[in-house]
Amino acid sequence: MNERVLLITGAGRGMGTDIAKAALAAGYKVVATGRNVEKVRDAIGNSDDLFVVKLDVTKPSDAEAAVDAAIERFGRIDVLVNNAGNFYAGFFEEISADNFRAQIETNFFGPVSVTRAVLPQMRKQRSGLVVTISSTGGIVGQAFVSAYSASKFAVEGWMESLAPEVEPFGIRTMLVEPGFFRTELLTKESTNYPEPLIDDYAEKTKQTFTAWKGMSGQQGGDPAKLAKAFVELISRDDPPFRWAAGADAVATFERKATELLAQANAYRSVSSSLSYDG
């Protein structure tokens, strides 16, 4: 029996619910958190190995309280899954400064706060795995996702830098970059769409809204399969540092790697000529 303890944020819907259920099925003790504890309980169901705690990731005090409660209940935390997030869509000029900051607050500073609360316990244990759900939007940017991609690019840089800092204490890190899965990401529950304000963007905004609404619920990725594979990977002695989840995510990685190499080669002679002479 697996007696490891997993704490996950944003467990009340979508991928968070699926991961929590898969972890329970694999024998984990699960601390499932969310802003609405009743919604989390209803989504996951009953289990003696489930402990539901209130946690708004934008409130560091909530993170500290949730971690304390988890340790009091189970005595340890072996896996942290930073999953909670949202999506402020729109062209950069039409996303308000407040909404842009709110996007970064939830998707970047949220995981930072929860991880900051968990790491002292993991250092004490001299073991642990910190997982943050990123996105292919953290690998490549595109139109209409500037705020979201900014938050995910920040996550990527932070997690890459965190890895060597905590490795001496037996703590591993893992980034997950899902492609398009049939979750609630494009629904009104998860996505905030701006009011069209600038005529130059109006037609493209309308086209994007229409395309995304048609895509919602039709994505090819099965979140239940993702959750099962995810739990299998985190249960390994050597979980991957970065996991491209989905065939489309793998294609995104390959395209980005090709583009970076091409850019490096295109200006190699100029870039290599910038050292002091002599």
Range-by-range predicted roles:
Residues 135:
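Residue(s) in the substrate-gating loop at a strand-loop-helix junction
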